[in-house]
């Protein structure tokens, strides 16, 4: 079981296929999705990877959390999520995941908070048919009707479908297809719609009810590995021959002096 990723919903568009068909897609953006911490079975009792995405101002982050980010040597994140993984699917702290973590044609599950609709009646919220327009019905055309019996059971059952706040719930949509990926720009193109509003954070995982795509990288596709002391790309690298010439010149100068 691999880790998922944290993505931001950018909006919808369409993509044209080779046969001329156009497919409606939702564009998801991976914005600095990095490993912040790793849970170990010996220390924590389970194996998981903690990912962070986006950026947050340090003054808006709690002091203990700032210490955790400083220990991991990553910038404060706007969204922090933990993914349970297999024992051989852990990642190094500071590693940044790429959009190539998923491949075209792969099925994924996407979790997010649905769009809030405010207080809605039973007809809009639950699809009730409503009552008759005439034949003795007055005032109650869009009412949900009876909510229970009389003395028995003497109460309204839990989860009775009634009017109330609609939307703004954490929901998971399963078996959505990845149409295309753009690793350079960090974009995922998912067929159809996904939960949430524009700018909302989503959790994208491998489909739990289907086998993993054979071409999906395991344990992950890493864009960059942080926390490594590497020389700058523009720094000149001396070859052994050049080093020998420099040492000889220094020795000759010392003998002449």
Curated annotation (Swiss-Prot):
PTM annotation: Methylated by PrmB.
Can the keyword Hydrolase be found in this entry's annotation? no
**Classification via InterPro entries:** Ribosomal_uL3, Ribosomal_uL3_bac/org-type, Ribosomal_uL3_CS, Transl_B-barrel_sf
Q: Which GO terms describe its cellular component?
A: cytosolic large ribosomal subunit
Give the compositionally biased regions (Low complexity): 225-236
Residue numbers bearing the N5-methylglutamine modification: 151
Which GO biological-process labels does this protein carry? Answer: translation
**Molecular-function annotations in GO:** rRNA binding; structural constituent of ribosome
Q: Where is this region: Disordered?
A: 218-257
The alphabetical list of record keywords is:
Methylation, Ribonucleoprotein, Ribosomal protein, RNA-binding, rRNA-binding
Cited PANTHER family:
50S RIBOSOMAL PROTEIN L3, LARGE RIBOSOMAL SUBUNIT PROTEIN UL3C
Give the protein's biological function.
One of the primary rRNA binding proteins, it binds directly near the 3'-end of the 23S rRNA, where it nucleates assembly of the 50S subunit.
- Could you tell me which NCBIfam families the record lists for this protein? L3_bact
> Which family is this sequence assigned to?
Belongs to the universal ribosomal protein uL3 family.
Q: What is this protein called?
A: Large ribosomal subunit protein uL3
Q: What species is given as this protein's source?
A: Sphingopyxis alaskensis (strain DSM 13593 / LMG 18877 / RB2256) (Sphingomonas alaskensis)
Gene that this polypeptide is encoded by: rplC
